[in-house]
């Protein structure tokens, strides 16, 4: 999608994978949201919305001027290298990723700052739930709405592991025992946040331009 349509926000990746509350990358690793055969800027970028920093190494370690100078130096080296070999999509994509990462330093903290959201909105997403995993998934869902508002093309939410019979922590829906209890726990985790997200998107006029997909790899 990001490859075909591009991004509407130059300060954020076109594909974001959200985590919160201890959600993990599923079995299969980051290859599950890789760019495949597309340029590198089309791979998913993980944002952990309830931690600081939300993206590893996102906080600048030097002044903006020094960082800009360093970035231009590296870009110059990479550009000269690409010219010397007659073009290389991977290197060109890396140069574009440098620029995106530079701009994300200011964009990501603003994205993750929920102080401007009303308590009613947070409650709608279940962020006040006594069930911690519901609250954490609701945190992701609220960030998903903010990303959609910001023009990010593709947003993926991550389910949280729960204690249940037969389920493996990184793949909490992949259960092999106590299915009724385990699936009830998982449904309780995601039901209110997903409902809140759809209601919020509709109320803001965003749902008409947004496709929501809730899916797993099988229906055990």
Question: What are the language-model segments listed below?
Answer:
Residues 1-220:
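Ligand-binding pockets and gating/stacking loops
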């Amino acid at each position: 999608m990001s490859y075909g349509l591009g991004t509407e926000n130059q300060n954020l990746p076109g594909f974001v994978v959200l985590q919160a509350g201890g959600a993990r990358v599923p079995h299969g690793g980051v290859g599950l949201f890789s760019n495949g055969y597309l340029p590198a800027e089309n791979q998913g970028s993980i944002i952990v919305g309830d931690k600081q920093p939300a993206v590893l190494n996102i906080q600048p370690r030097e002044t903006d001027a020094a960082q800009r100078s360093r970035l231009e130096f590296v870009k110059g080296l990479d550009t000269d290298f690409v010219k010397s070999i007659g073009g290389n999509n991977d290197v060109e994509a890396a140069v574009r990723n440098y620029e995106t990462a530079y701009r994300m330093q200011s964009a990501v903290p603003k994205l993750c700052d929920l102080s401007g959201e009303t308590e009613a909105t947070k409650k709608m997403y279940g962020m006040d739930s006594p069930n911690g995993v519901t609250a954490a998934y609701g945190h992701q869902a609220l960030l998903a709405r903010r990303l959609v508002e910001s023009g990010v093309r593709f947003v993926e939410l991550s389910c949280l592991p729960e204690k249940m019979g037969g389920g493996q922590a990184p793949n909490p829906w992949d259960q092999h025992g106590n299915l009724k209890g385990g699936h009830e726990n998982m449904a309780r985790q995601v039901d209110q946040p997903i409902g809140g997200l759809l209601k919020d998107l509709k109320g803001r006029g965003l749902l008409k331009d947004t496709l929501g997909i809730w899916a797993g790899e099988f229906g055990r």
